[in-house]
Amino acid sequence: MPLPQGDVTALFLGPPGSGKSALIAALCGKNVDTVEIPDGRQDSGVPSLRAAAPGLFLGELSCPPAAPGPWAAEANLLVLVLPGSEGSEEPLTPALGEAARAALARGTPLLAVRNLRPGDSQNAAKARDETAALLNSAGLGAAPLFVPPADCSSSDRCEELERLQVVLRTQAEALQRLLPPAQDGFEVLGAAELEAVREAFETGGLEAALSWVRAGLERLGSARLDLAVAGTTNVGLVLDMLLGLDPGDPGAAPASAPTGPTPYPAPERPNVVLWTVPLGPTATSPAVTPHPTHYDALILVTPGAPTEENWAQVRSLVSPDAPLVGVRTDGQGEDPPEVLEEEKAQNASDGNSGDARSEGKKAGIGDSGCTAARSPEDELWEVLEEAPPPVFPMRPGGLPGLGTWLQHALPTAQAGALLLALPPASPRAARRKAAALRAGAWRPALLASLAAAAAPVPGLGWACDVALLRGQLAEWRRALGLEPAAVARRERALGLAPGVLATRTRFPGPVTRAEVEARLGSWAGEGTAGGAALSALSFLWPTGGAAATGGLGYRAAHGVLLQALDEMLADAEAVLGPPEPNQ
């Protein structure tokens, strides 16, 4: 099986009317794939691309009006296309000459083509000499020169065109062995996802591919979840703690007790709705807002340990198999034993990944030795006697055990939605959330590279949409509870001096465009951005029968996202960890 190779882009530069399009069409032959310039950008100075062969793309750009320098810096191979001797336009403008000399200085292969006008075939030798002298005077004499006749594209045999084709293929094959493999960095994309993106592109073009990736990103954690927080007092206090809000914040529960079920969508995930449900004398009026007949899960809030009468009040609000859990606001007691067992197992598995007991603990089963010691009568009694729902004490640091318990008790889709909707309340919760974000990071990375391709400008920013990455990083920073307001809220809850927890963070915020660009440049490395812009779409073509998934845009975006997420996770673990003794 041949080793994967990189994609090579040869850019044809020349004045308008110099014959670039006809030359590329002749080199590509019939039935070629073309990357069209986006609507409304035909005169914007953006190259169009054609797939000439597996891993070889030919682009053309008229200079003027476009400035050749920035695009020439993106090409793996540069071809100067000079017009015939007729006309008043100079065949080699100063800008073209400067771009070509800069390419040679960078080590970019350079070729030159002089297209003859109709009737100039008899003067081919003279045209070759004149063009060679022109190139020598411009410091470009090292470039191989080709002088095809005017009717070369329509003839079956054209030695000069064939010679140019051989040189192009030879140069491309040499470069393909040096460039990163086309699919390098896309290992996280499964074959099904990659095929779906390509199918969307082939069906509806770049916009369809963008829509497919964007829709998949929006579906992450999009399951509907209606979570009731019911009680006679302090219902709003528990709701605000779960959402990471202070009283008076937008979206927080009002100070007055609710008189009927009231919805509070999670700020970042409106598909997750927390409902305050008053019980007893506080429910004084019929519900005005339509609400579920049965909630997906319910949290019973009581001042102390809930009684059987308290549980009886809320059982009709959920289906028999729905999660039911309690919170006591006096802070007394401990987390349920199964949650404590799971935390111990998780800590052990963090230190020793081979500890097979962690799975049993995770399910709340307990040690097998305890099970073996029980008598048949004990086992029968456990089956007949229904255990009461677990109860969590409310502490200043939040309710981390409650969130973990709910995520285990809910169906997978709703558990994922809840994980992404609520801010983490412990280092372990932050690690779980970061793992979920990391698993889906390929979607915003791919969206950033495709979105940039829809509105290209030369340079690394073309291959990767900086604004989209900036927004994604800012969203993740909020999701992990690293906004200054969230950090200050935790400092107040723990009775710490202002700024104590903020000093533990290292990830810069707010996320600026300059910060994202610096990270992209640092990740890509100096001198490796050549071809990034022109190859950003190349992953949509088959290469050698395999998926060609190249483009520095995706690899840089994915690398920057994962690196930043690791830094944010370290900050979240530091902020959510126990305070130091001297604080």
Swiss-Prot record:
Transmembrane segments: none
Motif, LIR 2: chain positions: 381-384
Gene: Irgq
MF GO annotations: protein-macromolecule adaptor activity
GO terms for cellular component: autophagosome; lysosome
Chain intervals with Acidic residues compositional bias: 332-341
Keyword Cell inner membrane: no
Keyword Coiled coil included in the entry's annotation: yes
Segments of this protein annotated with the region Disordered: 322-373
Disulfide bond residue pairs: 152-158
Phylogenetic classification of the source organism: Eukaryota, Metazoa, Chordata, Craniata, Vertebrata
Entry note about domains: The LIR motifs (LC3-interacting region) are required for the interaction with ATG8 family proteins GABARAPL2 and MAP1LC3B/LC3B.
Protein name: Immunity-related GTPase family Q protein
Naturally occurring in which organism (per UniProt): Mus musculus (Mouse)
